[in-house]
């Protein structure tokens, strides 16, 4: 999965 903000265990989509 993707997440914003990236702070958990998912794919950092904020990069």
Curated annotation (Swiss-Prot):
Is Disulfide bond given among the entry's keywords?
yes
Which organs or tissues contain this protein? Answer: Expressed by the venom duct.
User: Example GO molecular function term?
Assistant: ion channel regulator activity
Q: Where is the protein situated, by its record's location annotation? A: Secreted
| Signal peptide, first to last residue | none
- Record-level GO cellular component terms: extracellular region
In the UniProt record, does the keyword Transmembrane helix occur?
no
Source organism superkingdom: Eukaryota
Q: What keywords would UniProt list here?
A: Disulfide bond, Ion channel impairing toxin, Neurotoxin, Secreted, Toxin
Q: Which cysteines are joined by disulfide bonds?
A: 1-14, 2-10, 6-13
Q: Which family does it belong to?
A: Belongs to the conotoxin M superfamily.
- Entry text on domains: The cysteine framework is III (CC-C-C-CC).
What this protein is reported to do is described as: Probable neurotoxin with unknown target. Possibly targets ion channels. In vivo, intraperitoneal injection into fish provokes paralysis after 5 minutes.
Name-wise, this protein is Conotoxin In1696
